[in-house]
């Protein structure tokens, strides 16, 4: 009798467990999405229909695949429908603010400038979207871009001095040396008797910026920087291919062919970083310690006894991954699209070259004092960031029920802010919003539009990019030196195919023709 009672009790417990799991699954997969859809509909927000488990991922995948086949006119800057075909289609159906589903995750698309500013400027209530895919940390590192709360405050405080203007002033010479080194490689590609040099410049900029970040931030060699860059580029391919797939927790531990390759590449990246760190630890100087570059600042923090100024070695490795990847990607993309624009607009290229010759001569490596005099160059870079900014959208998540303008946003809702679209808003930028017109920045960013915070290439608010000044100094250094030594033109083989590869990337690269000057 006792045995039967025990069995009955276990059966009831098991049944309750199974029922609770079924209820939870029903809630996550069906009931919650239906409830939230109705809640948003009452606010006048609709969107594509939710599909169980997948949400709208299948539709996104299909639309992106079709858009990737489209080749645009090189003179057209109307790239939003190609880069984000899903947002373009849904905006035409549901308006400027709509709801869609990333799996079971509700996501609100907000392209209103004032609402976007409120979300990005908020210190409480919105945070970066929690990462569930393990390949994200393998690629980017669990560094400043992804940590939150007190850890983020501590890391930001420690890392800020590495990007001070005094430090940046000292970086222009090594940036220039790296640039001269790659110029020599370009000249070697010229065949006998040929005047022009044909190169795929987006790859070259990726290699150059990897060398610059390795040299200026980590004091590592060219070979070490390129090897690390190569491994991270391979990791990036796996990350991009996974974005439209549903992630099933636990699958990251299975020895699948993809996971095995990810583990192998991750090991290579970590070993490369450890070698760079070990080399710096061995070369510590009694006078200057570990140095005042990014790696030196972090290693100094590792020895601190104050928690607010201390970093663990595992945190340093993660920040190295983060800055190596972000440090090369942002500037290389900015340089790539600026080169395309100057190749198309030869008049502006000549204006910039004349300004460079007047302020910097024909062979001098520029410094930060020179940059303040290059007004036209700054205008061109601002316009390039507007039309082809590396960061094309920003994601946030509501950590509690929030009210933004007229919108009531439930806890756990993701928010997409489409910078690529907002930077082309004719209501803000005027009827020529799709046109390349650097003169709109003649009186500065704040006077370029009716909205003072309309240009957001590096975000805004507490989580604005820590290295934005580094990126701009790097871009100005490289661009100045290119204009000193080469005339730029597009190769006839170029296909205008901007694509969302986390950054805004040319799908088939950017082949250009370089004509050496002098």
Curated annotation (Swiss-Prot):
Per UniProt, the keywords (alphabetical) are:
Heme, Iron, Membrane, Metal-binding, Monooxygenase, Oxidoreductase, Stress response, Transmembrane, Transmembrane helix
**Could you give a single Gene Ontology term from the biological process aspect?**
response to salt stress
What are the names of the required cofactors? Answer: heme
Question: Might you report a single GO cellular component term?
Answer: membrane
Q: Does the record bear Nucleotide-binding in its keywords?
A: no
Q: What happens when the gene is disrupted?
A: No visible phenotype under normal growth conditions, but mutant plants show increased sensitivity to abscisic acid (ABA) treatment or salt stress.
Gene3D superfamilies registered for this protein in UniProt? Cytochrome P450
Expression induction: By salt stress.
Name the membrane topology term.
Answer: Single-pass membrane protein
Q: Which SUPFAM superfamilies match?
A: Cytochrome P450
Q: In which tissues is it expressed?
A: Highly expressed in rosette leaves and siliques, and at lower levels in flowers.
EC numbers listed for it are: 1.14.-.-
Q: Which residues cross the membrane?
A: 3-23
Compartments in which it is found: Membrane
Q: Provide the family line.
A: Belongs to the cytochrome P450 family.
Its name, as the record gives it, is Cytochrome P450 709B3
Record organism: Arabidopsis thaliana (Mouse-ear cress)
Q: What is the lineage of its organism?
A: Eukaryota, Viridiplantae, Streptophyta, Embryophyta, Tracheophyta
């Amino acid at each position: 009798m006792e045995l039967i009672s025990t069995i009955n009790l276990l059966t009831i417990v098991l049944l309750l467990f199974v029922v609770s799991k079924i209820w939870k699954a029903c809630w996550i997969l069906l009931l919650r999405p239906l409830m939230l859809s109705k809640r948003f509909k009452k606010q006048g927000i609709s969107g594509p229909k939710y599909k169980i488990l997948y949400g709208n991922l299948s539709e996104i995948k299909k639309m992106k695949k079709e858009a990737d086949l489209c080749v645009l006119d090189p003179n057209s800057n109307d790239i939003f429908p190609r880069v984000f075909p899903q947002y373009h289609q849904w905006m035409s159906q549901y308006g400027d603010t709509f709801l869609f589903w990333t799996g079971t995750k509700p996501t609100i698309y907000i392209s209103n400038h004032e609402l976007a500013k409120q979300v990005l400027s908020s210190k409480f209530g919105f945070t970066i979207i929690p990462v569930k895919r393990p390949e994200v940390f393998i690629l980017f590192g669990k560094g400043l871009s992804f940590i939150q709360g007190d850890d983020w405050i501590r890391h930001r405080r420690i890392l800020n001095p590495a990007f001070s203007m005094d430090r940046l002033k000292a970086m222009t010479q090594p940036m220039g040396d790296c640039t001269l080194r790659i110029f020599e490689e370009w000249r070697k590609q010229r065949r006998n008797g040929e005047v022009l040099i044909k190169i795929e410049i987006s790859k070259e900029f990726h290699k150059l910026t990897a060398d610059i970040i390795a040299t200026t931030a980590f004091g590592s060699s060219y070979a070490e920087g390129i090897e690390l860059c190569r491994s991270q580029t391979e990791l990036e391919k796996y990350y991009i291919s996974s974005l439209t797939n549903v992630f099933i927790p636990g699958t990251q531990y299975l020895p699948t062919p993809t996971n095995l390759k990810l583990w192998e590449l991750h090991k290579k990246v970590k070993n490369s970083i450890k070698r760079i760190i070990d080399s710096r630890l061995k070369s510590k100087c009694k006078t200057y310690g570990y140095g005042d570059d990014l790696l030196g600042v972090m290693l100094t923090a590792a020895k601190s006894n104050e928690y607010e100024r201390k970093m663990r070695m595992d945190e340093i490795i993660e920040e190295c991954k983060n800055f190596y990847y972000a440090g090369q990607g942002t500037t290389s993309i900015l340089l790539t699209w600026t080169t395309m624009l100057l190749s198309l607009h030869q008049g502006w290229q000549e204006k910039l070259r004349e300004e460079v010759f007047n302020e910097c001569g024909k062979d001098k490596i520029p410094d930060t004092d020179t940059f303040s005099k290059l007004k036209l160059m700054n205008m061109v870079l601002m316009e390039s960031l507007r039309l082809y900014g590396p960061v094309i959208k920003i994601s946030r998540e509501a950590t509690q029920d929030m009210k933004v303008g007229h919108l009531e946003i439930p806890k756990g809702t993701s928010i997409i802010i489409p910078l690529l679209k907002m930077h082309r808003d004719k209501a803000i930028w005027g009827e020529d919003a799709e046109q390349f017109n650097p003169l709109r920045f003649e009186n500065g960013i704040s006077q370029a539009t009716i909205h003072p915070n309309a240009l957001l290439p590096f975000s805004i608010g507490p989580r604005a990019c820590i290295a934005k000044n580094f990126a701009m100094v790097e871009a100005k250094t490289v661009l100045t030196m290119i204009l000193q030594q080469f005339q730029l033109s597009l190769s006839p083989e170029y296909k205008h195919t901007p694509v969302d590869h986390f950054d805004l990337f040319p799908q088939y690269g950017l082949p250009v023709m370089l004509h050496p000057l002098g």
